[in-house]
Amino acid sequence: TGLKGVKHGNRSVSSKSGSADLLEALNIPLADNPETVNAFLKEYGFVFLFAPFFHPAMKHVAPIRQSLGVRTVFNILGPLTNPAQPNFYLLGAYSSPMAKLMAEALSGMNIDRAFIVHGLNGWDEPTPVGEFELYDVKPNRVQHTVRDPKDFGIGRCTEDDLKGGDAKVNSTALINVFNQNDQGPHKDALV
């Protein structure tokens, strides 16, 4: 069964497909109220909190962010303002300075522990492409290390091996991993 997860996110702003886009392509409904959140969490052990439903002011900012097409301060604030106020966080950061900033911010929040990751290839997640930074955060303490997926038995791949696309392309790739039809880099990246 494992840990329950509450992901807080949005549609794509600076890429072709965001978390909400992927879930919609998979025909997974977005929870839009606290009752649905609790029901999904109880039944599935996971729920996605679509930011505009839970932070109404974000609806007014979304068109501006979309038109800019680049990362903004909201790429930092969004993950840190999860309405579920979890005790444990796992967050990806798009740059090394942002990973450090997020880790330092979380160390001053009411949390038990957090992990902030940044792929040294510039991605906001660890991948089989190469090494990644890991910030292990506890209240008033941040520990930084660099990890290599090879140390965990995961072989290398190229960025092209993990190249995504729009929500439909990405949802097909995810389904293939879940159905064990893809035993390559996508599966390794998901691990």
Q: Where are the regions a protein language model picked out?
A:
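Glycine-rich anion-binding loops and their surrounding alpha/beta cores
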Residues: 24-31, 36-191
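A generic, well-ordered mixed alpha/beta core segment in the N-terminal half of proteins
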Residues: 1-40
